[in-house]
Amino acid sequence: ELVSNASDALDKLR
């Protein structure tokens, strides 16, 4: 779950 959240955050920043 944490990994998924981090990936989402990075995608949003990108």
Curated annotation (Swiss-Prot):
What are the disulphide bonds in this sequence? none
Gene Ontology MF annotations? ATP binding
Q: Keywords, A to Z? A: ATP-binding, Chaperone, Nucleotide-binding, Stress response
Q: Does the keyword Chaperone apply?
A: yes
Say what the protein does. Molecular chaperone. Has ATPase activity.
The UniProt similarity line reads:
Belongs to the heat shock protein 90 family.
Quote the protein name from its UniProt record: Putative heat shock protein 1
The record lists the organism as: Pseudotsuga menziesii
